């Protein structure tokens, strides 16, 4: 179960508009997970929001088993940072999944023997409502081979997801070279 191998348990009391990050839009959002927690192209951690030295609201991320870098007014939330293909934007992006229900839905699918590794099928998340009235529903699409041009784009994309823990850009020129693997997860 390589997709789940490096996920860590989080204590229960822990708290798109294009570009490099996928933002869920109202209605249907279709994407394919490309990365893996095993090779670091997907990561999990904790996310808290606070003001930086200039007074700007800024995200602070750290690994699940690490100490929070500071105190936060609001409880930090667990997140998965997933490298995905966003079909609407036709681009590789990072989708930061913070909603507990969506994380649980993803884990349920990944553990299900009929669905398994979510890199082998597309996912659709339907977003309805605004603010505290927002609801989400995740639905898997039937298994299908990923298009060759998406696989090529993935191979050509250099990303260092651990940069998120340092408050840096994972797509920056200094991103680490990823080691090629023989396994085709798609």
Annotated model-derived regions:
Residues 128-156:
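OB-fold/S1-family single-stranded nucleic acid-binding modules
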